[in-house]
Amino acid sequence: WIMGHMVNSISQIKQFVNPGANAIEIDITFDSDAKAEYTYHKVPCDCFRTCGKWEYIDEYLKAVRNATTRGNRKYLRQLVLLIFDLKTSSLNRSTAYDAGKDFAERLLEHYWNNGENGGRAYVVLSIPNVRHYKFIIGFPDALNSEGHSELMQKVGYDFSGNDDLETIRRALRYAGVKGKNHIWQSDGITNCLSRTLKRVRKAVENRDSSDGYINKVYYWTVDKYATIRDTLDAEVDGIMTNYPNRVVDVLKEKCYSSRFRLATYSDNPFETF
């Protein structure tokens, strides 16, 4: 999966998908009442990017629904995965549950169109703070109460704060998620800084272990060609980047073209191959 990074304005969706992204990451902010408000990343953000682009969350969800609904004139066939980077710093342990319910209700109405020919992309809820695991409880509770528990088949989870993997496993258990159950594990840092692949390799080992909790692993934010190659050599499932075309270029190289291909809608992002 080639994950376009910080795709927070509607106009950026095509700008990232057309050069090769089949997934996009969207930053979500919450107001003081734990309600999703904007698609927005404050300053600072990645080097060589413009921080501060934003949309009202409901309008963005409608736009990305159009981009992922077959038959819509704005349909982008390649876009198959949405990663919502949930900026939960304004929440606490109790309001995280409320935020999860609110976000599920917004997705149900504005993205899934209340279950009637809505967007088809898979969804990853990426939470930076393990203490906010109750978001994961509130989200399915809202869908269940609305009679749309089937949509949880399209939803996965990620804790993105670079915590110890066993700490994340415990947080998932507290949230009622056991075993390898729709779990992506991220690792990374802003493209302005460097970070080793040590934790990525540990996550890959966990993914490939019979007693691990991880289904898929992705690394962020990867912009340099050399780092893209190193990341692929670590056997990740996804690369988050500001330059999707660079990942496409590397995937065409002989040593990678026989080992990797771009994921399509038929590839379940929550299954470990």
From Swiss-Prot:
GO terms for cellular component: extracellular region. It catalyses: an N-(acyl)-sphingosylphosphocholine = an N-(acyl)-sphingosyl-1,3-cyclic phosphate + choline; an N-(acyl)-sphingosylphosphoethanolamine = an N-(acyl)-sphingosyl-1,3-cyclic phosphate + ethanolamine; a 1-acyl-sn-glycero-3-phosphocholine = a 1-acyl-sn-glycero-2,3-cyclic phosphate + choline; a 1-acyl-sn-glycero-3-phosphoethanolamine = a 1-acyl-sn-glycero-2,3-cyclic phosphate + ethanolamine. Its EC number is 4.6.1.-. It is found in: Secreted. The keyword NADP does not apply. CDD domains: GDPD_like_SMaseD_PLD. The active site is at residues 5, 41. The keyword Cytoplasm does not apply. Its cofactor is Mg(2+). Keywords: Cytolysis, Dermonecrotic toxin, Disulfide bond, Hemolysis, Lipid degradation, Lipid metabolism, Lyase, Magnesium, Metal-binding, Secreted, Toxin. Disulfide bonds join 45-51, 47-192. One of its GO terms (biological process) is killing of cells of another organism. Expressed by the venom gland. GO terms for molecular function: lyase activity; metal ion binding; phosphoric diester hydrolase activity; toxin activity. Mg(2+) binds at residues 25, 27, 85. Gene3D superfamilies: Phosphatidylinositol (PI) phosphodiesterase (3.20.20.190). It is an enzyme of class 4 (lyase). It comes from the Eukaryota. Dermonecrotic toxins cleave the phosphodiester linkage between the phosphate and headgroup of certain phospholipids (sphingolipid and lysolipid substrates), forming an alcohol (often choline) and a cyclic phosphate. This toxin acts on sphingomyelin (SM). It may also act on ceramide phosphoethanolamine (CPE), lysophosphatidylcholine (LPC) and lysophosphatidylethanolamine (LPE), but not on lysophosphatidylserine (LPS), and lysophosphatidylglycerol (LPG). It acts by transphosphatidylation, releasing exclusively cyclic phosphate products as second products. This is Dermonecrotic toxin LarSicTox-alphaVII1. It comes from Loxosceles arizonica.
